[in-house]
């Protein structure tokens, strides 16, 4: 359970970083 939560959290953070990167490219 804990391992899964860490993986999900890591994936969400990676997604947010990717979105921020894409937004910077567009601006």
Curated annotation (Swiss-Prot):
Membrane topology, from the record: Single-pass membrane protein
One BP annotation, GO: DNA damage response
Induction comment: Repressed by LexA, induced by DNA damage.
Signal peptide positions (record): none
Keywords: Cell inner membrane, Cell membrane, Membrane, Transmembrane, Transmembrane helix
Cell inner membrane found in the keyword field: yes
Disulfide bonding pattern of the chain: none
InterPro entries per the UniProt record, alphabetical: DinQ-like (IPR048189)
Any GO CC annotation of this UniProt entry: membrane
Domain of life: Bacteria
Subcellular localization, as worded in the UniProt entry: Cell inner membrane
Transmembrane segments: 6-26
Family: Belongs to the DinQ family.
Protein name (record): Uncharacterized protein DinQ
Gene: dinQ
């Amino acid at each position: 359970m804990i391992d899964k939560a860490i993986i999900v959290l890591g994936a969400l953070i990676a997604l947010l970083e990717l979105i921020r990167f894409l937004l910077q490219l567009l601006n």
